[in-house]
Design a protein with these regions (language model features):
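Structural motif
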Residues: 34-37, 95-100, 140
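Extended low-complexity intrinsically disordered regions
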Residues: 18-65
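Structured beta-strand/loop patches that form or line metal/cofactor-binding pockets in enzymes
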Residues: 58-81
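C-terminal binding/interaction regions
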Residues: 96, 118-123, 127-169
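A general alpha-helix detector
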Residues: 27-28, 103-107
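Amphipathic alpha-helical interface surfaces
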Residues: 40, 73, 100-105, 116, ...
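Conserved interaction-surface patches within small, structured recognition/assembly domains
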Residues: 80-99, 109-113
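Globin-like tetrapyrrole-binding proteins
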Residues: 2-10, 15-18, 146, 153, ...
Length: 169
C-alpha cells in the first residue's frame, strides 16, 4: 500500500466487527459521520455533482458497460485492470436526474478508484450503513449502493480468476 492509500479503521461506536477501510474511503465515511441526517443528504447530492465524466471510449457505448439493475435509476459501470500494479479503475454512468444514484457512484469512485484489488475486495458490505444514510435514504436506494459495491467486487474476482491461468502459464 502506498502512503496515500494507508488503511484506516472505520468503526462505528460499539462496532466490534470493525473492518479496515482504505484511507480515501475512510475519509468519506468520516465526512458523513460528522453530519446530521439532512446534511448527509446534502453531501450526497454534492457528491452526485462530482461524479467524473466517462472517458470518451465509453460515452454512448453502454453496451461495453454492465448495468446495475438493482438501482432504481439507470446505472452502468465498468472496470479497467492494471494487472502489473494490481489496481482497478472504476467508471460509472448515471443520469443527472438520478442524484442519489450518482452520489453513491461518486462515493464509490472517490473511495475505490485506483486501489489494489485486495483493498477493494476487503471493503465491508455494510458500507452504506457506515455512511449513516438509513434515515435519509430509502432502503431500496441503499440496496442500490450495496449492489454497486457487490458488482465491483464480483468483477474483480472474475478478472482475477480469468487472469490467474494466464499468469501461471
Amino acid at each position: 500500500m502506498s502512503e496515500d492509500q494507508e488503511a484506516q479503521p472505520a468503526s462505528q461506536p460499539g462496532d466490534s466487527s470493525a473492518r479496515v477501510l482504505p484511507e480515501q474511503l475512510a475519509e468519506v465515511v468520516e465526512e458523513f459521520a460528522e453530519l446530521e441526517d439532512r446534511q448527509k443528504l446534502e453531501l450526497l447530492l454534492e457528491f452526485s455533482r462530482e461524479l467524473p465524466e466517462l472517458p470518451e471510449r465509453y460515452r454512448n457505448s453502454y453496451d461495453q458497460m454492465e448495468e446495475v439493475v438493482e438501482c432504481q435509476s439507470p446505472l452502468f459501470l465498468t472496470l479497467e485492470y492494471d494487472d502489473a500494479a494490481g489496481t482497478a479503475a472504476i467508471f460509472f454512468a448515471a443520469p443527472p436526474e438520478a442524484p442519489t444514484t450518482r452520489g453513491f457512484a461518486a462515493i464509490l469512485h472517490e473511495g475505490l478508484n485506483g486501489l489494489r484489488y485486495e483493498e477493494i475486495l476487503a471493503v465491508p458490505e455494510d458500507l452504506s450503513e457506515r455512511l449513516g444514510l438509513s434515515k435519509a435514504i430509502t432502503p431500496l436506494r441503499l440496496r442500490g449502493m450495496t449492489a454497486m459495491l457487490g458488482r465491483i467486487k464480483r468483477n474483480i474476482r472474475a478478472h482475477q480468476a480469468e487472469s490467474a491461468p494466464a499468469q501461471a502459464g
